Structure formats: C-alpha cells, structure tokens
Amino acid sequence: MNDHYWHSNYWDPLYAVHEELNVTWGFHEGVSAVYSRMIPLYGENRFYRHVASHWIEMQQAMVAMIIGGVFEFHPRLRVGFLEAQNSWAPGLLSRIEWDYPQYRASHAPYLTLTPREYFRRNCWAAVEGSEAEIEATAGLIGADRMCISTDYPHFDSNFPHVSENLLKNVPREIAAHILVGGAHLYGFTEADFKKADAAAAGRG
C-alpha cells in the first residue's frame, strides 16, 4: 500500500501508535481496491481476483509481518487476518518454519523467536463459521488464535448466522476458544467479561 510493503520502516510510526494505544491492526484483502496487487495478475476478471486475493494477500502480509521483523520490533502489536478464512495459515507457518533454519542467520538475524512463536504471540486468523476445516485448523494453530468474522455485508457473508454455524460445526469447547480468542484480539480481558456479566445482571 502506498508503494510500501508491510515490513517497510514506513509503517513503523503507525505500528508504534497501535501499540501505544492498545489498538488492534487488521488485514483485509483488497480485491476491489485500485491498488490491489491482484489487478496486474488477473486484470478485470473478478472471479480470479476474488479467489486469489483472499489467501494470497493474507499470506503475503503474514510473511512480511513475521519474516520482516514487524513482530520482533513491535512485540505488543495484535494483528487479525480477517474475512479470508484461515485454513491457509497452518501450511504457511509450516513453510516459514521449514525455511527458518536455512535463512534466519543470513537474511533475518534480527529474529529472536520462531515463526510459530511470533504467530502465537501476535496473530489471530478469522473463520466465518461454516468452513469444513475449522476443527482441523484449530488443532494446528490453536483455537485461541482464531476468531470469527461476520463478513457483513458482503454477498458471500454468512451474516447473521456466523456464531450459530460455528456452534453447529465444531465442538463447543473449540467454539468457546475461538469466540474468546476474538475478544482477546481486540484487547478484552477476563476482567472485562466479568464487568459485562455484572452489568447484564444489574439490568435483569
């Protein structure tokens, strides 16, 4: 974006402000954006662009944030990969970890954690409730590092049935971790949940 990729120092002031203010950073694909990197590849064919942009742009962003050292230099930055499903995440993490021993010392000596450790500390990847791969993905990246996206008001959205679909498709324990994971992505803690419970009880 703005001719600067996500690991560029250009974005450091914005990352720092997000950390300081405790504000979540979210990635969303850019299939309709005039600056989309998919347009030079697929032109005006929206089918091509819609399929490719959701996973490819998310993967490009995660590679930049992990390998490019954004999470190393901004350790308190919380990042959500949103409205693009998430079954791509385990495979990409495995690929980064495969290359990590060969390239870290020569190309990314600033990294002090493994790729999976950065993901576990800084990342959440969203589901939309009806994907067949949710439970398998949760087993690979952790249900607590997942969240849900309603994808409203897009034409392929499951809104308003996202949470309902999630509860139908995975065991309740996994669904609970995913729902709480989303709350943690946006900085809510157990103390916030207790305050909400107390407020709701007071209204009753």
Give residue spans per PLM region:
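Short His-Asn-centered micro-motif
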Residues: 82-83, 125-128
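Alpha-helix-centered segments that form part of catalytic cores
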Residues: 116-126
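Histidine/acidic residue-rich metal-binding segments in metalloenzymes
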Residues: 2-118, 133-144
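A short, flexible beta-alpha/helix-coil linker loop
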Residues: 1-2, 162
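Mid-to-C-terminal alpha-helical segments outside catalytic/metal-binding sites
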Residues: 68-69, 77, 88, 124, ...
